[in-house]
Design a protein with these regions (language model features):
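Helix-loop junctions at the membrane-solvent interface of multi-pass transporters
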Residues: 27, 62-63, 81-82, 129, ...
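Short, hydrophobic transmembrane alpha-helix segments
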Residues: 25-43, 59, 63-65, 88-89, ...
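Transmembrane alpha-helix interface/packing and boundary motifs in multi-pass membrane proteins
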Residues: 57-67, 143-152, 189-201
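Juxtamembrane and boundary regions of transmembrane helices in multi-pass small-molecule transporters
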Residues: 3-32, 114-117, 173-190, 194-209, ...
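Hydrophobic alpha-helical transmembrane segments
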Residues: 23-28, 58-63, 146-149, 271-272, ...
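Hydrophobic mid-bilayer segments of alpha-helices in multi-pass membrane transport proteins
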Residues: 11-21, 46-84, 96-107, 159-163, ...
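Membrane-embedded alpha-helical segments and adjacent helix-loop junctions characteristic
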Residues: 35-39, 56, 69-175
Length: 300
């Protein structure tokens, strides 16, 4: 947005980020510190610049001064300009396989949302739910976690949000804030994070972590291998979060009458599955097959 910097809420953090970076870059040399082995460790000019860049990026990200991608590119440019790292090394990292994997997972999420597959799956799941509020909690959280198996958790949260609004409007037609509403939306955010650790498609951190792991150890972890270890933890976290939310945000009412009928009506309103939706399913299925092929054929 061309006018965004006229907003003090963006301008001040923008200046603060630059000031934090320059303050650390221009900081006088600090005394050496001593590591546990007794060796003296000094903070170089590149080290100070790296710390300043960390603060700059963090401030800009937290306050949404610039689009996330623009800030990300700025990190690489600043590293080159201030000679924090060699230009070739700094900019080549943008072509790392983990970066492209993250981009791919975001595109899968965008395809699901754009074609309406996310809504179709969500409405279908709701038609199978009980109208008891604790079960609605469980169903909404399980649905959120399930969707994060195939698409980025941020895309899932954006897709599920309108659906939860429908549920809450049926629970409280006046729109008044309720404990149930707080639990529904807070729990959705938490379980999106919990479910996203199960597969590499759920969040960027998994792919990045595996990239670091391969760089440090030389070993690779397959798509199914990480799911094998993370699935029990992810499922347990979702279950514990459901219990916690049910206790802390105990609903004022015991049920939401007509929820199943409303979900059935919304699902019917989508009509039969379209060619675009079928095509998306086939393409995503083919992508996942390629990603997991090495688990079955190690020679690949």
């Amino acid at each position: 947005q061309p006018m965004q910097f006229r907003n003090p809420r963006r301008t001040l953090p923008f200046i603060l980020g630059i000031a934090a970076f320059l303050a650390l870059v221009l900081l006088p040399d600090l005394p050496d510190t001593v590591d546990p082995a007794g060796r003296a460790v000094s903070l170089s000019h590149e080290g100070k610049a790296a710390l300043g860049l960390f603060l700059l990026a963090g401030i800009w990200w937290v306050f949404e001064v610039l689009p996330v991608g623009v800030t990300g590119v700025t990190i690489g440019v600043v590293q080159s300009f201030w000679m924090i790292r060699n230009t070739r090394v700094a900019l080549t990292d943008f072509m790392d396989p983990s970066v492209w994997f993250i981009l791919g997972s975001l595109l899968i999420g965008a395809a699901f949302v754009r074609t309406g597959l996310t809504r179709r799956m969500a409405y279908l799941m709701l038609t199978r739910l009980s109208e008891k509020t604790p079960i609605i909690y469980l169903g909404a959280f399980a649905m959120t976690a399930t969707l994060t198996l195939f698409m980025a958790h941020t895309a899932v949260a954006a897709a599920v949000f309108p659906l939860l609004l429908v549920i809450h409007n049926m629970y409280e037609p006046t729109g008044r804030p309720t404990r149930f509403g707080k639990g529904l939306f807070i729990g959705m955010a938490w379980t999106a994070g919990a479910g996203s650790i199960i597969t590499l498609l759920g969040a960027a951190r998994g792919a990045v972590a595996l990239g670091f792991y391969k760089e440090l150890t030389g070993s690779t972890v397959s798509f199914f291998e990480i799911t094998w270890f993370m699935a029990p933890l992810g499922v347990l976290m979702v279950f514990l979060l459901w219990i916690y939310v049910s206790l802390v945000f105990k609903p004022e009412k015991s049920e939401v009458p007509g929820l199943r009928e409303k979900a059935t009506e919304l699902y019917a309103g989508l009509g039969p599955i379209t060619k675009r939706e079928i095509g998306t399913i086939l393409i995503v299925g083919a992508v996942i097959t390629v990603l997991t092929a090495r688990s079955f054929v190690p020679a690949l």
